[in-house]
Protein backbone atom coordinates (compact mmCIF):
# COMPACT_ATOMS: atom_id res chain seq x y z
CA UNK A 1 0.00 0.00 0.00
CA UNK A 2 1.18 3.52 -0.81
CA UNK A 3 0.66 6.03 1.99
CA UNK A 4 0.65 9.77 1.40
CA UNK A 5 1.24 11.91 4.48
CA UNK A 6 0.02 15.44 3.81
CA UNK A 7 0.77 18.52 5.88
CA UNK A 8 -2.90 19.23 6.47
CA UNK A 9 -6.33 17.79 5.67
CA UNK A 10 -6.95 20.18 2.75
CA UNK A 11 -3.82 18.90 0.98
CA UNK A 12 -4.88 15.30 1.60
CA UNK A 13 -8.30 16.04 0.12
CA UNK A 14 -6.79 17.74 -2.95
CA UNK A 15 -4.60 14.68 -3.60
CA UNK A 16 -7.56 12.34 -3.08
CA UNK A 17 -9.72 14.36 -5.47
CA UNK A 18 -7.13 14.06 -8.24
CA UNK A 19 -6.69 10.33 -7.57
CA UNK A 20 -10.42 9.64 -7.74
CA UNK A 21 -12.00 10.70 -4.46
CA UNK A 22 -11.72 7.80 -2.11
CA UNK A 23 -13.61 7.06 1.08
CA UNK A 24 -13.05 9.08 4.24
CA UNK A 25 -12.19 7.10 7.34
CA UNK A 26 -11.02 8.08 10.81
CA UNK A 27 -7.93 10.21 10.13
CA UNK A 28 -7.31 9.16 6.53
CA UNK A 29 -8.80 8.75 3.07
CA UNK A 30 -8.87 5.26 1.55
CA UNK A 31 -8.48 4.68 -2.18
CA UNK A 32 -8.70 0.86 -2.25
CA UNK A 33 -8.72 0.59 -6.07
CA UNK A 34 -5.25 2.20 -6.08
CA UNK A 35 -4.00 0.45 -2.95
CA UNK A 36 -3.42 3.94 -1.56
CA UNK A 37 -4.27 5.76 1.63
CA UNK A 38 -3.83 9.44 2.38
CA UNK A 39 -3.44 10.79 5.89
CA UNK A 40 -2.42 14.16 7.27
CA UNK A 41 -0.74 16.15 9.97
CA UNK A 42 -2.13 19.20 11.74
CA UNK A 43 1.08 21.19 11.79
CA UNK A 44 3.77 19.62 13.95
CA UNK A 45 2.33 16.52 15.61
CA UNK A 46 5.42 16.09 17.77
CA UNK A 47 7.13 18.29 20.32
CA UNK A 48 10.33 18.10 22.33
CA UNK A 49 10.05 16.70 25.82
CA UNK A 50 10.27 19.23 28.63
CA UNK A 51 13.59 19.65 30.49
CA UNK A 52 12.26 17.59 33.41
CA UNK A 53 12.28 14.52 31.16
CA UNK A 54 16.08 14.59 30.92
CA UNK A 55 16.91 15.20 34.60
CA UNK A 56 17.11 12.35 37.11
CA UNK A 57 14.29 12.81 39.59
CA UNK A 58 12.32 14.95 37.14
CA UNK A 59 12.94 18.28 38.86
CA UNK A 60 15.09 20.89 37.14
CA UNK A 61 17.29 22.88 39.49
CA UNK A 62 19.61 25.78 38.71
CA UNK A 63 22.64 23.47 38.66
CA UNK A 64 21.01 21.43 35.87
CA UNK A 65 20.83 24.42 33.53
CA UNK A 66 21.20 24.51 30.67
CA UNK A 67 19.59 21.15 29.97
CA UNK A 68 21.18 19.93 26.73
CA UNK A 69 20.68 16.21 26.15
CA UNK A 70 22.75 14.20 23.68
CA UNK A 71 19.56 13.61 21.74
CA UNK A 72 16.25 15.41 22.13
CA UNK A 73 13.22 13.16 22.49
CA UNK A 74 10.15 13.97 20.44
CA UNK A 75 6.73 12.87 21.66
CA UNK A 76 3.21 13.40 20.31
CA UNK A 77 1.60 16.67 21.30
CA UNK A 78 -1.35 15.99 23.59
CA UNK A 79 -3.93 17.16 21.02
CA UNK A 80 -2.21 15.21 18.25
CA UNK A 81 -1.87 11.80 19.91
CA UNK A 82 -4.87 10.27 18.10
CA UNK A 83 -3.62 11.34 14.66
CA UNK A 84 -0.10 10.09 15.45
CA UNK A 85 -1.66 6.70 16.26
CA UNK A 86 -3.54 6.72 12.95
CA UNK A 87 -0.29 7.41 11.08
CA UNK A 88 1.59 4.77 13.08
CA UNK A 89 -1.05 2.14 12.27
CA UNK A 90 -1.07 3.09 8.58
CA UNK A 91 2.73 2.88 8.40
CA UNK A 92 2.49 -0.76 9.48
CA UNK A 93 0.51 -1.48 6.28
CA UNK A 94 2.60 0.70 3.96
CA UNK A 95 5.13 -0.43 1.35
CA UNK A 96 5.95 3.15 0.41
CA UNK A 97 5.37 6.57 1.95
CA UNK A 98 5.02 9.79 0.00
CA UNK A 99 5.83 12.95 1.93
CA UNK A 100 3.25 15.53 0.85
CA UNK A 101 4.29 18.28 3.25
CA UNK A 102 4.33 21.86 2.01
CA UNK A 103 7.03 22.73 -0.53
CA UNK A 104 9.49 24.21 1.96
CA UNK A 105 11.91 23.08 4.68
CA UNK A 106 9.26 23.19 7.37
CA UNK A 107 6.91 21.06 5.27
CA UNK A 108 9.70 18.54 4.74
CA UNK A 109 10.53 18.42 8.46
CA UNK A 110 6.92 18.22 9.59
CA UNK A 111 6.48 14.81 7.95
CA UNK A 112 10.08 13.56 8.17
CA UNK A 113 10.28 13.99 11.94
CA UNK A 114 7.58 11.33 12.31
CA UNK A 115 9.65 8.57 10.71
CA UNK A 116 12.23 7.86 13.46
CA UNK A 117 9.62 8.23 16.21
CA UNK A 118 7.25 5.81 14.46
CA UNK A 119 10.08 3.48 13.34
CA UNK A 120 9.51 3.92 9.58
CA UNK A 121 12.56 2.89 7.53
CA UNK A 122 10.91 1.93 4.26
CA UNK A 123 10.87 3.55 0.84
CA UNK A 124 10.01 7.23 1.08
CA UNK A 125 9.28 9.62 -1.78
CA UNK A 126 8.37 13.29 -1.96
CA UNK A 127 5.98 15.46 -3.93
CA UNK A 128 6.19 19.24 -4.02
CA UNK A 129 2.83 20.96 -4.16
CA UNK A 130 2.97 24.65 -4.96
CA UNK A 131 -0.80 24.97 -5.21
CA UNK A 132 -3.87 22.84 -4.54
CA UNK A 133 -5.66 23.34 -7.85
CA UNK A 134 -6.28 20.14 -9.81
CA UNK A 135 -3.63 20.77 -12.48
CA UNK A 136 -0.89 21.58 -9.93
CA UNK A 137 -1.66 18.46 -7.90
CA UNK A 138 -1.75 16.31 -11.03
CA UNK A 139 1.66 17.64 -12.14
CA UNK A 140 3.15 17.10 -8.67
CA UNK A 141 1.95 13.49 -8.66
CA UNK A 142 3.76 12.95 -11.97
CA UNK A 143 7.02 14.30 -10.53
CA UNK A 144 7.49 12.10 -7.46
CA UNK A 145 11.13 12.21 -6.29
CA UNK A 146 13.15 10.45 -3.61
CA UNK A 147 12.48 12.07 -0.24
CA UNK A 148 16.12 13.06 0.24
CA UNK A 149 16.21 15.32 -2.84
PLM regions and their residue ranges:
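Intrinsically disordered, low-complexity regulatory segments
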Residues: 1-149
